[in-house]
Amino acid sequence: YSPRWDDKYKNRDFTNWPDLVTRNGHEQNHFVNITGNTKNTSYRVGLGYQNEEGVLYDAYERWNIKAAVDNVINEHWAAGASVNLSTALKRSGSKNSVINGFRMSPMMDAFYWDGENAGAPVAQPGKDPAIYPYGGGPTSTLNPLVDREHSKDNTRTYNAMANLYLQYSPIKEVILKTTLSPMYDRNKEGIFYGGNTTQERNGKTNYARTIGRDAFSYTWDTQANFIKDFGDHTINALGLFSVYQQKTEGDGLITTDMPFDVDWYNMGSAANVEDKSSGYRKISMLSWVLRLNYDYKDRYLLTVSSRWDGSSKFQKNNRWGCFPSAAVAWRITEEPWMASTKDWLSNLKLRLSFGVTGNNGAVGPYQTQLLANTKYYYNFGNVVANGYGYALSNKDLTWEKTTEFDFGLDFGFLNNRINGSVDLYTRNSHDLLMEMETPLEMGSSTGAIWGNVGKVRNTGLELQLNTVNIQSRNLTWTTSFTFARNKNKIIELNGGKQDMTGNGWFIGQPIDVVYGYVPAGICTAEQAAALAADASKKTKFY
């Protein structure tokens, strides 16, 4: 029994916990830019600042500087470079504070209401003796405001990006260009839960954690363009060779029972090291691209292209994927017999396209390699073997591919003040890269293995309508309307039509279907035996 609860209920003095763990957020952005040029050189320099105060008592602050220069050396040569440097600090605050704030009863006090502690936070609103003088109480949950005060989760980020290019044009119709784009990214996250936090209530005093990540990547593109007009005909041909590589290093450390409340800066003094880790990964990819664009009088348009990508994530026999595409378009408004509609019909174009795209982003760089765990030792006579394979590998992994057919219509009226598009598409994805559940008896402690497991079909409709309502020197008012409808359906799993219930995948259903049992009433023992004997009856999923 709590006399305080009686008073709160009689006076309708309820605590608005969601209001206490949230606030009004705001954001500010500032950018200063300086540009200039001479006869053959142009340059630009910019400085930016961003500051956000989040609704959940989180915050984000970012500084960045940009600089670029382009130079025409002579009639054949040109070169340029750009750089973007930034640093940011993200303060995530206490996740437990927000979650528990929305769970707390409005009958619980956030602050002492009188006495010498009036105005101070109540550490445990569900157990405090001032509220429950006879003992007991509904919960030992920590006051979310106290949790927030003693919790920190900060991430500092440093990022540097550059782009350097050299261009050579031996004749007017040919452009040769090579571009190097390196990028360096460093992240350091520090987490600290001191006294009077949820972590401490879970037996972890002065919990500190650091996570570090360094990543360096570069893309090197070399391309050749050929552009030529032959009367009413225009040809634009492109050939490109691209190299991409990324190296990432990471480390982590978790400690508890630090003697000082100094965030994560004195982890060497901690009594317990709960976890330590480090890691390295490398990803490489080579790409070839060929593309041909053709148009006749800007009326009939044709594009044919193909790219070949080789990824280090796959074994040599499955490393390369070929992804062709083609598209045709007809600008009906460019036909001579449409000249009478020019005053009200600005654009009318039909489009038809086909293309194949590839995806390898779902898997890590070493999913085709057998991984070992060093926690266990095996004695083979006089030889002690350290480690065992703990994750099953799949050497047959290959690219996930999506084949898409698209039919579209673009339209514009009244000098394109009203314009939009309609698209109908079908996307068939096959060799999906997904994890499959496996019995532990197969030798995997993870209970899963990556595979190219099935086929999924997406069909949909997309509509877009844009209008320019007012356009003047001092005022512009535009509106946009977008509608999209997509239907997703699993066609095949693991080469057949068998459901994979362990993963929640069912033939004919969406890949992320929400499913459950449909109650059909009480089943007697006799009915259960009859149903079990009839193998043709299956459980229905909705």
Segments and roles (model prediction):
Residues 99-103:
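Acidic, Ser/Thr-rich peripheral helices and adjacent loops at domain boundaries
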Residues 28, 61-63, 67-77, 82-87, ...:
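Extracellular/periplasmic, surface-exposed regions of secreted and cell-surface proteins
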Residues 92, 109, 196-199, 303:
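Core alpha/beta catalytic barrel or barrel-like domain that forms the active/cofactor pocket
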Residues 19-21, 198, 279, 383-384:
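Intrinsically disordered, low-complexity segments enriched in polar/charged residues with Gly/Pro
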Residues 1-56, 94-97, 112-153, 166-169, ...:
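Residues embedded in well-ordered regular secondary structure
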Residues 9-10, 199-203:
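Flexible, solvent-exposed loop segments that connect beta-strands
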